[in-house]
C-alpha cells in the first residue's frame, strides 16, 4: 500500500502555500532570550462509525465555532460544558484542513534549527492513527509533513543557497515500558539518555537518511507493520503501543563562519486510554492496557506539575514522559491534536480527553535555535619538517654551510620580536596536528584583513634571528644566576661567627640540601636585616638546635649495577629543657583551666575527648601533671604520648616567638 496515492494535487497546493517569505530562516535571535511558546491544542471530532447509530442518537458534542465546542453536562442535562481551544475540527473536516490549519505552520521552525512535535491524543477508537497516518486516499499528518519537509529541504539546498540541508528519520514504539526500534526490531530495549545541554536522545536508535518521499516510504511502510496492534471489543485494530516518528533536519552553512543547525520533528501517535470493563481485555491485552493507562496517567501528572509550577516535574516516571520532555515544558514548538468520538458510550472518555487538552494549553515551552560552529570547517595544511622543529632541533639539523652563512640584515630583530619569543617557544613543542589548524586559522584571518602577527609565516632568516635572541637571553639569565650565588656567598661569609667565640657558644649546624624537614630553607637573595633582628635570631638559636647525630646507611639504586650503600647524615631537633618545661606548664594550665572549646584547639583533642576531660576535672579536680590524662576513661597511654608530641613543640615555639 502506498502513501502517495491521490496526493499529488494536494502536494502541489501545500508546496505553493509554503513558498515565499514565510519560509525564510531567521537571522537573529542567537543572542536574545528564547521567546515563550505555548502548547497549541486542537480538537478533532470524528464522525459516527455507522449510519444506524447516527440515526438513533444525537452526538454528545456540538460545535459552536471554529475554536469552541460544547458537551452535554451529565450532572445537569439542561446545561452544557463549553470548551475553547486554538482550533476545532468537526466531523466533516478533512485531513487537508487539519494539516494546513495546525501542523504546517510549525515546519518552518525546523529550518531555523528549532524542534517541533505533533501529538495525537484521545481514547481508543477515536481516530488518532487515522489523523496521523490516514489512508492512500486521505493521507494524514505524517505523509503530508514529510512531503512538505523534503520539498523545503530541496529548495533550501538548491545551488546558490547558503545552506546544505539533509533529512534523516528514526521510528520507534514504547511497548509495555520498553523502547523498541521499529526499523531494527532485533535491537531490543533501548535506553533514553539526556546530554549536557538537556536534549533527549536514544543511543543505538537506527537512523535512515532520506532524500525523497520514495525513500521515506521504503523505510516507513515495513516498519509500520512491526508496530504492536490488537483487537478489542471497541476497536478491531487498536494500537497497543505509543509510536514516535523522529525526523532530523541537519543544516550546514557553505560559507564562513560554517555554522551548523539541527532541528528535530517528533510525530507521535499515542495509544488510547482504555476501560477494561468495556474492552474485555484479558491476559496480554490486560497487561498492555495497564502499561498504556499508567503512562497516560503520568502524562497527566506532568501537565499538572507544569501548570502548578512545581519544582519537580515527574518526567522520569515513565518512558513516554521522558521522551516527551522536550515537547512538554521543553524547547519544542508543540501541537496537541485531541481526537474525540461523538457516541454517548464514549462520553466519559470524551470529557477526560477534553479536560486533559484544556490543561495542556497552559503549558509553556521555550524554543531556541540549536546552532554551533563546525570545528573541522578549515582544510588542514601540512608543514615542512624544518618548520615543525624546535630551536634546539633546528640548530642540530642545519648543515655547516647554513650555520656559517649570514648577513648584516639577519642580526637585526624586528620591532615585535619580544612579542613573538614566548609564542615561538610554545609553538616549537606543540602537536603537529594543532599546528596545522593554527596555520589554517591564521591564513583565514589574513584573508579577512586581520592584523595579527604571522608567527608561522615568518621567513626562515627572521626565525633564526629570533631563536638566536632567545639563546642570548638564556645565557644572560645564567650569568645573573652566577652573580647572585656570589652575592649570597659574600653575605654568608659576613654573617659567620668569630672563631674566638666558638668555644663559648653552641655550634649550629646547617642541614644539607637533601634534608627535607620542617626547618625553613634559606633565602636565595641577599637581605640586609636590622641589628635587633639578628640578635634575636642568635638568642633563639640557644633554645632550639639542629644537631648532627651521625652517619646513617641507606641503600640507593644504581643505573649501572645493583643497589649501593650510601652514608647520609642523621639530624635531630634538640630543644632546651627550660623551653620544654615552660611548654609543659602552659599545656597543664590549659588542661586545668581551659573550656571545652579551648581544649578542642589542641592537636588530637576532639569534641568527645574535650567533654571527657572537662567532666573528669569536675569530678576529681585539676590535673597534677599532663600524664594524668591516662586516668580519663577513653584516653590511653599511647594517646597521651602522641598528644604530648603534637602539642609541646607548638606551644613552646609559640611562647618563644611571642613578645617578651
UniProtKB/Swiss-Prot annotation:
Binding site for ATP: 122-129
Biased composition annotated in UniProt, kind: Low complexity: 405-418
Positions of post-translational Phosphoserine modification: 407, 422, 447, 540, 576
Cell compartment(s), UniProt: Nucleus; Cytoplasm, Cytoskeleton
Domain Kinesin motor: 38-363
Entry's Gene Ontology molecular function annotations: ATP binding; DNA binding; microtubule binding; microtubule motor activity
One Pfam family linked to the record: HHH_3
Processing and modification events after translation: Ubiquitinated; mediated by SIAH1 and leading to its subsequent proteasomal degradation.
Coiled-coil features, chain-numbered ranges: 460-505
Gene3D superfamilies: AF1531-like domain, Kinesin motor domain
Record-linked SMART domains: HhH1, KISc
Stretches with biased composition (Polar residues): 505-516
BP GO terms, sorted: DNA repair; metaphase chromosome alignment; microtubule-based movement; mitotic metaphase chromosome alignment; sister chromatid cohesion
Region of interest: Disordered: 1-31, 391-418, 493-516, 534-567
Superkingdom classification of source: Eukaryota
Residue location of crosslink Glycyl lysine isopeptide (Lys-Gly) (interchain with G-Cter in SUMO2): 460
This protein's GO CC annotations: chromatin; cytosol; microtubule; mitotic spindle; nuclear speck; spindle
Record key words, sorted: ATP-binding, Coiled coil, Cytoplasm, Cytoskeleton, DNA-binding, Isopeptide bond, Microtubule, Motor protein, Nucleotide-binding, Nucleus, Phosphoprotein, Ubl conjugation
Protein function: Kinesin family member that is involved in spindle formation and the movements of chromosomes during mitosis and meiosis. Binds to microtubules and to DNA. Plays a role in congression of laterally attached chromosomes in NDC80-depleted cells.
Complex and partners: Interacts with FAM83D and SIAH1.
Record-stated family: Belongs to the TRAFAC class myosin-kinesin ATPase superfamily. Kinesin family.
Name under which the protein is recorded: Kinesin-like protein KIF22
Organism: Mus musculus (Mouse)
Gene: Kif22
